[in-house]
Amino acid sequence: MLPAQKALAFDRIEQSGAPLGRWALKESSASLKLSVAKAEVELSYLDLPKLQEIDQLIKQTEEGFTLERLKRRRMLREDMGDGNSRVISFPIWQVGNAIFVALNAEAYSHFQVSLRKRFPNIAVICMNIANGYLSYLPTKEAYDLPDLYPAKVAVFEKGCLEKTIDVSVATIERLIK
């Protein structure tokens, strides 16, 4: 690790059979920027049964794992509400030359890879399942793969991860201006 407020800078070429680059420490001031923004995105649900439908299924189901799954689905649907979509919000911080994204879902690694590609000169730290848990956010392509668990149990429609990436990019752009 480099000393505080130092950076490596190209110094000169040194001949040693082959040209070698020499690097030296130089003064570098640390960014003191500290800011936060709330990202908000409306995500559509998959075609999920409403609470009343789940309650009917629970009444018709004998004891066992099916009943347990229905009870869990009911708790999830109760939290989600009977609507067709939900606005999720999550904080994004700029701390110096780093960005922290605290997503309250479990996004595929495509989320952080996309943000890091979009902001190659910034350290982007993505935190999944922060401040609660809503669902998996698989890629569009993952929904078409047979028997892929995260896509099978996700509650949000295909494309919601990509929508979340777009909103995150726009929020980060506002922060770093």
Where do the language-model regions lie?
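Non-catalytic substrate/cofactor recognition surfaces at enzyme active-site rims
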Residues: 1-177
